[in-house]
């Protein structure tokens, strides 16, 4: 988990503000507080609030119980909150390039070093009018398990054509449209 890059960006921006007033940023997160991804974000908020005392603080207004997970980006765009922590897949209609993030095997540190974060930020600004600061828990991969030995095509790529996969709304289009798998949603 590479949170230091995002923390450094926020703290650098905060330090550039006038010293006379503490800036308070409001934030929401897409998932319940008990989920590991949200816990990473909340740990980040704690560190910013500790290190930014007197300069910048982040006030978390809640998760999907406060603002629906699919409405959070619009809440940032309209100024209801200042930040949202959520997967790019949740605003796929406005940002189809998010598939590069979903399929990436790079960490956030590597993406920042090679200019990837800057490019993603430019696209966010152009298409959505928002600044993209980075992502948490980078390097987390998606794993597929199967009872039967998988098949590979002539190029050595995994063939999942016709295989039934448990899915969810975040990955279903990728599984069906790109991989050709059959998706079954389970609670």
What is each of the regions a protein language model found here?
Residues 1-7:
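Bacterial N-terminal signal peptides that target proteins for export
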Residues 53-56, 72-86, 180-182:
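Alpha-to-beta junction loops
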Residues 45-46, 82, 87-186:
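Contiguous mixed-secondary-structure segments that line small-molecule binding/active-site clefts
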Residues 15-21:
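Sec/Tat signal peptide C-region and signal peptidase I cleavage site
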Residues 34-59, 170-174:
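Short, polar/charged alpha-helical segment
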Residues 26-43, 63-68:
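Extracytoplasmic "Venus flytrap"
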Residues 61-74, 168-170, 181-187:
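Short helix-initiation/N-cap motifs at beta->coil->alpha
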Residues 8-9, 19:
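Cleavable N-terminal signal peptides
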């Amino acid at each position: 988990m590479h949170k230091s890059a995002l923390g450094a960006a926020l703290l650098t921006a905060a330090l550039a503000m006038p010293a006379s007033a503490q800036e308070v940023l409001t934030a929401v997160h897409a998932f319940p507080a008990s989920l590991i991804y949200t816990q990473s974000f909340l740990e980040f908020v704690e560190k910013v609030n500790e290190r930014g005392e007197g300069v910048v603080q982040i006030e978390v207004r809640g998760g999907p119980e406060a603002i629906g997970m699919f409405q959070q980006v619009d809440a940032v765009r309209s100024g209801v909150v200042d930040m949202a922590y959520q997967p790019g897949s949740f605003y796929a209609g406005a940002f189809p390039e998010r598939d590069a993030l979903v399929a990436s095997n790079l960490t956030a540190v590597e993406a920042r070093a090679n200019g990837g974060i800057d490019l993603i930020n430019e696209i966010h600004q152009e298409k959505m009018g928002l600044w993209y600061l980075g992502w948490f828990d980078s390097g987390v991969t998606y794993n597929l398990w199967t009872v039967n030995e998988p098949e590979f095509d002539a190029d050595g790529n995994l063939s999942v054509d016709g295989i039934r996969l448990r899915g969810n709304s975040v990955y279903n289009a990728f599984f069906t449209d790109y991989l050709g798998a059959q998706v079954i949603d389970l609670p």
